[in-house]
Curated annotation (Swiss-Prot):
Gene3D superfamilies: GHMP Kinase, N-terminal domain. Phosphate binds at R86, G124, T125, R126. This is Ribonuclease PH. Its EC number is 2.7.7.56. One of its GO terms (biological process) is rRNA processing. The keyword Membrane does not apply. The keyword Aminoacyl-tRNA synthetase does not apply. Phosphorolytic 3'-5' exoribonuclease that plays an important role in tRNA 3'-end maturation. Removes nucleotide residues following the 3'-CCA terminus of tRNAs; can also add nucleotides to the ends of RNA molecules by using nucleoside diphosphates as substrates, but this may not be physiologically important. Probably plays a role in initiation of 16S rRNA degradation (leading to ribosome degradation) during starvation. It is an enzyme of class 2 (transferase).
Length: 239
């Protein structure tokens, strides 16, 4: 039995609140149960130096957690003068995941930065950031389209979403909350497109290596879960 009472293949309640920020070109407050992340997409009329005069744009991401997003207050990384390794890893993952479904040539020489700020953390912050970040990116591109800068269907090739899966109490489960994640035998994150293409898989065994059969079980859970998330994304942007 999972601590939350959920079935092994049952995700937490997921919601998207679009246009949460009045200033950003695109924004979304995404909630995976008690994990809440504010994703904003900001358009800049510039590209990284290595892309200048290439006609290509760029999509990148930054990630952070508010000091009291967790059970005990964390010091702001800015106060320490540098980002931690976990933060850098997660924001690179978010950027890679979103770029996987963007035609950078069709975007033109512009940069879109996704800022994913965790308001409340209860496991799965990186997967929530990717899934909600796609909504914010979509709305940013719609903003650009409304000003005749691009055509969304030429720039955005597909949906992308992410979910965590793991082995908890000898069972393959989906969408781990913090309690499960902190004591899981295996923890994995899956990033996939709406068409089912795999963008990235991160998997780690805690103590006991996991088997190919267990990995296949996690993969099946993730594929079904991401299908549900993509359906929710479609529902959100249609509203």
């Amino acid at each position: 039995m999972r601590p939350s009472g959920r079935k092994t293949d049952q995700m937490r309640k997921v919601s998207f609140e679009r246009n949460f920020s009045k200033h950003a070109e695109g924004s979304c407050l995404v909630k995976f149960g008690d994990t809440h992340v504010l994703c904003t997409a900001s358009l800049e009329e510039k590209t990284p130096p290595w892309l200048r005069n290439t006609g290509k744009g760029w999509v990148t991401a930054e990630y952070g957690m508010l000091p009291r997003a967790t059970g005990e207050r964390m010091k702001r990384e800015a106060a320490a003068g540098k980002q931690g390794g976990r933060t850098q890893e997660i924001q690179r993952l978010i950027g890679r995941s979103l770029r996987a479904v963007v035609d950078l040539q069709a975007l033109g020489e512009k940069q879109i930065t996704l800022d994913c700020d965790v308001i409340q953390a209860d496991g799965g912050t990186r997967t929530a950031s990717i899934t909600g970040g796609w909504i914010a990116l979509y709305d940013c591109l719609k903003w650009m389209e409304s000003r005749n800068m691009i055509k969304v269907d030429r720039v955005l090739k597909d949906h992308v979403a992410a979910i965590s899966c793991g082995v908890f109490a000898n069972q393959a489960v989906i969408d781990l909350d913090y309690l499960e994640d902190s004591s899981a035998e295996t923890d994995a994150n899956f990033v996939m497109t709406g068409a089912g293409g795999i963008v990235e898989i991160q998997g780690t065994a805690e103590g006991t290596p996991f088997s190919e059969e267990e990995f296949s079980s996690l993969m099946r859970l993730a594929k079904n879960g991401i299908g549900e998330l993509v359906a929710l994304q479609k529902q959100a942007i249609a509203g």
